[in-house]
């Protein structure tokens, strides 16, 4: 098994991180107080109680119920900045070099908070992460799939200035997967893509939904990346396609265990994806709720796949860099750093 020191030093990219999912209990309660938010009856009353609840979710919906309550404490641009900045401070110490992060404006606009407030707060934190830590980042605006597509089209309208000027680098699709297949959002994706030819497209698919949802996201939504995608393992033709096109899956091992998608990280088809040359990155998803940030994810995977050597981990890190949406100069610099770290620890 490789050392934690090696995993920490390995340059890491994160592509599946919900900023609202980094809301730790020790920030949630102070923000509730700052903004005079009364948490619902029956909600845990202390950091300790809430941490206990986060240790055991029944399924995706049980988690989402808590997740959406948590978002209610975020009101001002400063709140959104504080949230994202807390994330960047943590992951900087863990060897993160590039982050492409999700946010859910509809969780906030539905409460009367403007998309400008949310986006500007998060973007300020991204700017500071670059100036202070050298971390490059991109914002991915997600549509909530449990919201009517007509409402999602309105969200895209509201976000138009940020899509056109590149503040929003990509469009994503999240929330409860099974009842809301990709075909419902064809018009939304087409509309967003028409606003900026450089807008990247991704979608959550194949987590609780079938492999067919992955194929549909590729065919109908024209995405070039799949978030989760682990159920692709059951479709041999799809695996061939993902390998041929080098379509990256953004896999979230701790999340998959916490939400009972699998019982342990060792059950994930990571070795199969490596063997089939299907590129993937390892990510923390909603780390405040799922018990670990990026280095915790890498460390747990290394325990469950102890036969992976330095070269294998170097390959995983390189696939994450190659699948990122940063420019070639940045990619080449990071790829060289991976080689340096692998060489350092292999001798």
UniProtKB/Swiss-Prot annotation:
Instruction: Copy out the induction comment.
Output: Reduced when grown in a poor nitrogen source medium and strongly down-regulated when cells enter quiescence under nutrient-limiting conditions.
Q: What is its EC number?
A: 3.5.4.2
Q: Which reaction does it catalyse?
A: adenine + H2O + H(+) = hypoxanthine + NH4(+)
List the catalytic residues.
207
- Stored PROSITE patterns: A_DEAMINASE
Tell me the GO molecular function terms. Answer: adenine deaminase activity; zinc ion binding
SUPFAM superfamilies, per database record: Metallo-dependent hydrolases
Q: What does its pH dependence look like?
A: Optimum pH is 7.0.
Q: Consult the record and explain the modifications the protein receives after translation.
A: Probably ubiquitinated when cells enter quiescence in response to nutrient limitation, since it is specifically degraded via a process requiring the F-box protein SAF1 and components of the SKP1-Cullin-F-box complex.
Top-rank taxon? Eukaryota
One GO location term (cellular component): nucleus
Q: State where the protein is found.
A: Cytoplasm; Nucleus
Q: What class of enzyme is it?
A: hydrolase
Instruction: Cite the position(s) of the site with description Important for catalytic activity.
Output: 228
Where does the chain bind substrate?
286
Q: Keywords for this entry? A: Cytoplasm, Hydrolase, Metal-binding, Nucleotide metabolism, Nucleus, Ubl conjugation, Zinc
Q: Which residues bind Zn(2+)?
A: 16, 18, 204, 285
The temperature dependence reads: Optimum temperature is 30-37 degrees Celsius.
What is the annotated signal peptide range for this record? none
- Alphabetical GO biological process terms: adenine catabolic process; hypoxanthine salvage; nucleotide metabolic process; purine ribonucleoside monophosphate biosynthetic process; purine-containing compound salvage
User: What binding details are noted for the cofactor?
Assistant: Binds 1 zinc ion per subunit.
What extra comment accompanies this record?
Present with 20700 molecules/cell in log phase SD medium.
Q: Which family does it belong to?
A: Belongs to the metallo-dependent hydrolases superfamily. Adenosine and AMP deaminases family. Adenine deaminase type 2 subfamily.
Q: What does this protein do?
A: Catalyzes the hydrolytic deamination of adenine to hypoxanthine. Plays an important role in the purine salvage pathway and in nitrogen catabolism. Also exhibits a low activity towards N(6)-substituted adenines that are commonly known as the plant hormones cytokinins.
Q: What is this protein's name? A: Adenine deaminase
């Amino acid at each position: 098994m490789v050392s934690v020191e090696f995993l920490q030093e390995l340059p890491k990219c994160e592509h599946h991180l919900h900023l609202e999912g980094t809301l730790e209990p020790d920030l949630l309660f102070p923000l509730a107080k700052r903004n005079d938010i009364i948490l619902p009856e029956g909600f845990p009353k202390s950091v300790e109680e809430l941490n206990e609840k986060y240790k055991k979710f029944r399924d995706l919906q049980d988690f989402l119920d808590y997740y959406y309550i948590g978002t209610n404490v975020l009101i001002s641009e400063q709140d959104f900045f504080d949230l994202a900045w807390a994330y960047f401070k943590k992951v900087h110490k863990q060897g993160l070099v590039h982050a492409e992060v999700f946010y859910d404006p509809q969780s906030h606009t539905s409460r009367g908070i403007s998309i400008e407030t949310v986006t500007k707060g998060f973007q300020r934190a991204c700017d500071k992460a670059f100036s202070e830590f050298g971390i490059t980042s991109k914002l991915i605006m997600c549509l909530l799939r449990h919201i009517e597509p007509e409402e999602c089209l309105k969200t895209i309208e509201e976000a138009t200035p940020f899509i056109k000027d590149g503040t929003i680098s990509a469009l994503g699709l999240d929330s409860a997967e099974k009842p809301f297949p990709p075909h419902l959002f064809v018009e939304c994706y087409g509309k967003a893509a028409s606003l900026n030819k450089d807008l990247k497209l991704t979608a959550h698919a194949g987590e609780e939904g079938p492999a067919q949802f992955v194929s549909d996201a590729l065919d109908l939504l024209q995405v070039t990346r799949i978030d989760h995608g682990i159920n692709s393992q059951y479709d041999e033709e799809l695996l061939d396609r993902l390998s041929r096109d080098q379509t990256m899956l953004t896999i979230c091992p701790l999340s998959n265990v916490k939400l009972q998608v699998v019982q342990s990280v060792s059950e994930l088809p990571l070795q199969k994806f490596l063997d089939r040359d299907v590129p993937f990155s390892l990510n923390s998803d909603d780390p405040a709720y799922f018990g670990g940030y990026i280095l915790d994810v890498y460390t747990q995977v290394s325990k469950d796949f102890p036969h992976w050597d330095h070269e294998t981990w170097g390959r995983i890190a390189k696939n994450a860099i190659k699948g990122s949406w940063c420019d070639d100069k940045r990619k080449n610099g990071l790829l060289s750093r991976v080689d340096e770290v692998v060489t350092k620890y292999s001798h």
